[in-house]
Design a protein with these regions (language model features):
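Signal peptide-directed extracytoplasmic domains
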Residues: 69-125
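Bacterial N-terminal signal peptides that target proteins for export
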Residues: 1-10
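Soluble oligomerization/assembly scaffold segments of membrane-associated complexes
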Residues: 119, 124-219, 224, 231
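N-terminal targeting signals for Sec/Tat export/insertion, comprising classic cleavable signal peptides
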Residues: 31-60
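Bacterial N-terminal signal peptides
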Residues: 10-18
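Acidic/histidine-rich, surface-exposed loop or edge segments in extracytoplasmic proteins
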Residues: 29-30, 92-101, 122-127, 169-170, ...
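Sec-dependent signal peptide cleavage junction
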Residues: 18-26
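Charged, long alpha-helical assembly modules
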Residues: 219-293
């Protein structure tokens, strides 16, 4: 009996080890997610952008149906289209490394938009490259990142978090068309930073808070955009607010640096314009003086 019991314990332990091994992943592990509607030449071009040979990294496929699972109803159907084109190369990084995102030939989703949406969805510590064989919105890439990350880790991300991440991506993108991508990202990050306050506020009070935040960034938002932001806020409140706030710090620093750089460029351009205007004015006065003599 003792022998049988010992064998049972050993077998159970082996099963546990096998199960944990099946879901173990390590730093440096990677996946490539390819849009299902690419032909062989386009796939070759994508791998060239990624700087790797096809077959070196495990590959998965993303379909338009996969994309619609998260984005349908959130964005104009034209943005989603009926084909999956954008592609992703994701590599797991050391704990605490954060998210690195780079894009190429993506004309709607920005790197910061992806980063924010992925953080909301629960993806951290990864290097993500997004590209396509020609210019596309890049919405399909979010689904590709989700699928690739889950394939690497062997664990499913929260369905709610993935849906909210997708909604955040779309709301940010739509807002960016009117007020600029940096401003849209910063505004939503500010909103995420006060979720512990907004969750106890009425819709009317949250709307007032959104208007205040918009004023801080010197941007105007319409009533429709405020409604969108309110809806996103209520969805974000359903997630782990403390985790979101912790992840927000590094992202906010990145956005602030981008906005500071933009301000410096704007001030430099203004200074140059003023100097050129002043110079031309001086030249004009000089010649005017010559002709008046």
């Amino acid at each position: 009996m003792k022998c049988k019991r010992l064998i049972s314990i050993i077998m159970a332990a082996l099963c546990l080890l096998t199960m944990s091994g099946a879901f173990a992943y390590k730093v440096g592990e990677a996946r490539v997610a390819i849009g299902a509607n690419l032909d062989s030449e386009q796939i070759a071009a994508v791998y060239s952008d990624f700087g790797i040979e096809r077959g070196v990294i495990p590959e998965i496929t993303v379909t338009n149906e996969n994309e619609r699972q998260y984005l349908e109803g959130l964005v104009d159907d034209k943005k989603i289209g009926h084909k999956a084109i954008s592609c992703v190369y994701i590599t797991i990084l050391d704990d605490g490394s954060g998210l690195n995102v780079s894009t190429k030939i993506i004309n709607w989703c920005t790197e910061q938009m992806y980063k924010n949406a992925l953080t909301t969805a629960g993806i951290t510590d990864a290097d993500v490259k997004v590209t396509a064989p020609f210019e596309v919105s890049g919405t399909a890439a979010l689904t590709g990142i989700y699928k690739a990350y889950e394939d690497i880790t062997g664990n499913s991300l929260s369905s709610l978090a993935k849906m909210v991440g997708a909604e955040e991506l779309i709301v940010t993108g739509q807002l960016a068309e009117y007020i600029g991508s940096d401003e849209a990202t910063a505004l939503i990050n500010e909103l995420k930073g006060i979720l512990d306050i907004t969750e106890t506020m009425s819709d009317a009070d949250v709307k007032k808070e959104i208007k205040k935040l918009a004023d801080q960034y010197n941007v105007q938002v319409t009533d429709e955009q405020i409604e969108q932001l309110l809806k996103l806020c209520r969805q974000l409140e359903k997630l782990d607010i403390n985790q979101l706030k912790e992840k927000l710090v590094s992202i906010t620093n990145t956005v602030e640096k981008a906005m500071t750089a933009k301000d410096k460029v704007a001030k430099t351009v203004t200074t140059i314009t003023e100097k050129v205007t002043g110079f031309l004015g001086s030249v004009s006065k000089f010649f005017a003086g010559l002709f008046n003599k």
